[in-house]
């Protein structure tokens, strides 16, 4: 866990499916649940509870991944993946790295060899009956 690497972006993937997470009216919590559902849909597993409403802890294969969820207001429904990437500055990366390391230290098992921090934006447009999710993998990785 002592070496930080630069991540090469992956090719954007567009997938559509019917969301099943209920909408409760608590926008931040709803966005976190929709992010969890979207990540599950693309193979993320073993979700764990975190003390933060806007942070998910899960795994992609054996890799522990900590995910920040950015709830985007409906006015930002046209936000693109590039827009999300532009919001990930040094402060976000440092915060993500700290979340990853804190999660690793709080776990009961041995420290993992690798950690990763991702960022997911979620925008719910109830009028259109649509949700837009963007996922930046590897905003930080050790």
What do these predicted ranges mean?
Residues 2-50:
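Acidic-basic catalytic patches of nuclease active cores, encompassing PD-(D/E)XK
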Residues 52-54:
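Short acidic/glycine-enriched loop/turn segments that link adjacent beta-strands
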Residues 56-57, 123:
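Conserved protein-kinase catalytic-loop segment immediately C-terminal to the catalytic Asp
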Residues 58-76:
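Active-site beta-strand-loop-beta-strand hairpin of nuclease catalytic cores
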Residues 63, 113, 129-132:
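Residue-level signal for beta-strand positions within conserved beta-sheet cores that form or flank
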Residues 64-68, 116, 135:
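Short hydrophobic-acidic sequence motifs that mark active-site Asp/Glu residues
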Residues 70-126:
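Catalytic cores of nucleic-acid endonucleases
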Residues 118-142:
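Short, low-complexity, polybasic intrinsically disordered segments
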């Amino acid at each position: 866990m002592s070496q930080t690497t630069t991540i090469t972006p992956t090719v954007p993937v567009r997938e559509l499916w019917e969301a099943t997470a209920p909408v409760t009216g608590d926008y931040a919590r709803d966005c976190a649940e929709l992010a969890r559902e979207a990540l599950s849909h693309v193979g993320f597993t073993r979700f764990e509870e975190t003390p933060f409403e806007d942070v998910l802890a899960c795994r992609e294969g054996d890799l522990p991944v900590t995910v920040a969820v950015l709830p985007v207001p409906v006015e930002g429904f046209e936000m693109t993946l590039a827009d999300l990437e532009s919001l990930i500055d040094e402060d976000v990366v440092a915060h993500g790295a700290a979340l990853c390391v804190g999660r690793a230290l709080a776990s009961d098992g041995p420290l993992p060899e690798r950690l990763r921090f991702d960022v997911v934006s979620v925008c719910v447009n109830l009028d259109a009956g649509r949700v837009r999710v963007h996922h930046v993998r590897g905003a930080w990785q050790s």
